[in-house]
Amino acid sequence: MANKSASLRPDSKNHFLAMRLEGLFKTVTVRTAAGQTEPRQSLREIGRDQVSFTFENVRGTLVGFRQPHYLQGVGIAGDHLHFITEDRKKGGHVLALESDGEVEVKAAQMYTMTLELPKGDQEFNEATLVGSHKDLKAVEG
């Protein structure tokens, strides 16, 4: 896996990288949050109820992005991957993974980004969108 992940390092730390890994994984550890129980809960509140699972000898797909650090806040800087099993019944946010090599790796460096915001949405207009870096670290690690 280390050899394949080295090929995912783009020649620029300032571009996005889209990734897809598909195959047999020795282990994949994921976490899943329970979801909101009321509107506008903070990320930290939602993250308190997350649970972790480790799948062993599992086939599935990981998809995600490597986001440049200067865009922290628009998204999550660094690697952000999600996993779903081949039968599409289990998955979550990837915390750790290990493979013996039966994995197909696809990646593409991205040079454009479009950010579309809601128009005419009063709730969005009044929302406090700046999150706490501490809350993000507590949930994302």
Regions found by a protein language model. Give the residues of each.
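Well-ordered alpha/beta subsegment
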Residues: K119, A127-G141
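Histidine-centered divalent-metal-coordination microenvironment in nucleic-acid enzymes
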Residues: I76-I84
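Long, positively charged binding patches that form subdomain-scale interaction surfaces
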Residues: S7-F65, Q72-V74
